[in-house]
């Protein structure tokens, strides 16, 4: 059975209305240049405009690769821990979420894992899929790959167009090959949207 290689990336930098900025397009363009050497089979993207625009920019570098929307990749909170397990620093973040919203977020997160965090069904060669999504979805997939408790998605940050690669094999647990790699970006395009204090 073949292996699945998931190339997870957060959309390029977006403005306050969720539209890709010029910087975001440049970030996506540079990532496209990096990925044009990889045998990508498909590009999947969130339905939100910033992810769609990132996919369109990336697709110019991968002209023969199909591009499709995947609803599971939409930006959402994948899991809300019980109140006693929420770190003090995160408590305000979950204010206003009710049980229905929490259940819907968990349903989407479970569907994301069921659809993409598996070995390919076909016994053919390895598959290479790009998922253009959002920080929380990347954190959830990394948490799942590491078999960490559900609340450990909190605090796993992904920068715009940073690359995270997870490999799924039939006989071993998933392998996180790289996390939040920005080597394709010059220093001024890294960590966009993050406070200067955390930029290494």
Name the predicted role of every residue range.
Residues 1-3, 64, 75-85, 99, ...:
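Acidic, low-complexity terminal tails and accessory targeting/binding regions
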Residues 5-10, 123-133, 141:
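Beta-strand elements within well-structured catalytic alpha/beta cores of enzymes
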Residues 12, 135, 182:
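Active-site metal-binding loops of divalent metal-dependent hydrolases
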Residues 94-126:
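Internal catalytic-core helix/loop-beta-alpha segment
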């Amino acid at each position: 059975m073949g292996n699945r290689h998931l190339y997870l990336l957060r959309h390029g930098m977006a403005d306050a209305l969720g539209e890709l900025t010029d910087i975001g397009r440049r970030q996506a363009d540079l990532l496209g240049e990096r990925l044009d050497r990889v045998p990508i089979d498909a590009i999947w993207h969130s339905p939100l405009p910033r992810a769609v625009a990132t996919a369109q920019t990336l697709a110019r570098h991968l002209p023969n690769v199909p591009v499709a929307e995947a609803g599971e990749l939409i930006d959402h909170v994948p899991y809300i821990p019980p109140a006693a397990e929420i770190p003090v620093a995160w408590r305000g973040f979950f204010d206003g979420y009710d049980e229905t919203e929490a259940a819907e977020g968990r349903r989407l997160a479970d569907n994301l894992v069921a659809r993409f965090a598996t070995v390919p069904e076909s016994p053919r060669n390895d598959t290479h899929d790009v998922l253009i999504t959002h920080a929380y979805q990347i954190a959830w997939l990394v948490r799942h790959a590491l078999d960490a408790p559900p609340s450990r998605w909190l605090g796993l940050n992904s920068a715009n167009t940073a690359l995270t690669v997870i490999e799924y094999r039939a006989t071993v647990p998933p392998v996180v090959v790289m996390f939040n790699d920005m080597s394709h970006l010059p220093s001024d395009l890294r960590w966009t949207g993050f406070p200067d204090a955390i930029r290494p």
